[in-house]
Regions:
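Conserved nucleotide-cofactor-binding alpha/beta core module
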Residues: 1-62, 70-78, 149-225
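A generic secondary-structure signal marking the coil-to-beta-strand transition
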Residues: 47, 64, 84, 116-119
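Donor nucleotide-sugar binding/catalytic pocket of nucleotide-sugar-dependent glycosyltransferases
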Residues: 64-76, 81-96
Length: 225
C-alpha cells in the first residue's frame, strides 16, 4: 500500500498512520532540512526508527531504535545515543548497484584540468567543510605540483568564501575548480576523473562517498564524532 502524503497536513498524516495501524514507522530524514521528525512525537506507530538520512542520535524519547553498523556507531560511542541500536553486518547503507553512468565520455580537459594533473576532489556540500580540512588541503597544494582541488559549487557565498580562503593562503586559484550540478549519471561519469576523494571530518560523506566508490575513486576519510 502506497500513500502520497506530501501535501497532507501533519496531523492528518498522523491520523492516517493510526487508521492504517502501521506497525513500524521509520524516519529517513531526522534533523535535516524539510524533515517530518515532529510527526513521530505523536507516535504514528508502536515502534519508531531513525535510519539513513541522519546517522546521529535524534535525542528523543519517541524514537526507539536507530539502524547502524560498527563503523557508523562503534561500541565506544553507543552511550551517546538515546535510541537502542540495531546493528547491521558490514554496512548499514543500502546502495543501488545499478546506478547508471553516462555513456558520453568526457576528458579532464572538459572540466578545465590539465591532462596529466592529479585531481583531489571533495564534492560534499560546502557546509560540511571546516577550517581543519581547508588547512590540510592547503598544505597538500603547497607541497605538490600539478595537483588540483575539485569542490562542489553549491552556492555563491560558499564558493566565494572558499576562494578567499585559498587566496589568503597564496594558493593559485586556478588550481581550485568547482563542479557544477549535473544529472546523476553525468556526475558519476565526470567523477571518474578524480584521483582521490577527500572526505570531511565533522560531517562525513554519505551518498557522495558511495558515488565515488561506485566509480572506482578511493576515499580518504576520518571518523567523525
Amino acid at each position: 500500500l502506497y500513500k502520497d502524503v506530501s501535501n497532507v497536513p501533519d496531523l492528518e498524516i498522523v491520523k492516517l498512520s493510526r487508521e492504517l495501524k502501521i506497525d513500524i514507522a521509520i524516519d529517513l530524514k531526522g534533523h535535516t532540512l524539510n524533515s517530518k521528525t515532529k510527526l513521530f512525537a505523536y507516535r504514528m506507530a508502536p515502534i519508531q526508527i531513525n535510519y539513513l538520512g541522519y546517522p546521529g542520535s535524534l535525542g528523543t524519547s519517541f524514537i526507539d531504535y536507530i539502524i547502524a553498523d560498527k563503523i557508523l556507531i562503534p561500541d565506544s560511542e553507543s552511550k551517546h545515543y538515546s535510541e537502542k541500536i540495531i546493528y547491521l553486518p558490514n554496512s548499514y547503507q543500502p546502495n543501488d548497484n545499478q546506478r547508471e553512468i553516462s555513456k558520453i565520455e568526457t576528458k579532464k580537459e572538459d572540466f578545465d584540468f590539465p591532462e596529466n594533473s592529479l585531481i583531489l576532489s571533495c564534492l560534499n556540500s560546502t557546509y560540511k567543510i571546516t577550517p581543519d580540512e581547508l588547512e590540510i588541503w592547503s598544505r597538500i597544494l603547497e607541497k605538490t605540483n600539478n595537483t588540483y582541488l575539485w569542490l562542489l559549487d553549491t552556492n555563491k557565498q560558499g564558493k566565494n568564501n572558499l576562494i578567499n580562503f585559498f587566496k589568503n593562503k597564496n594558493i593559485d586559484i586556478k588550481r581550485i575548480k568547482f563542479a557544477e550540478n549535473l544529472s546523476h549519471s553525468c556526475h558519476l561519469e565526470r567523477l571518474r576523473h578524480s584521483d582521490v576523494f577527500l572526505d570531511t571530518f565533522n560531517v562525513n560523506a554519505h551518498t557522495t562517498c558511495s558515488d565515488a566508490l561506485w566509480v572506482g575513486v578511493p576515499v580518504v576519510t576520518k571518523q567523525g564524532k
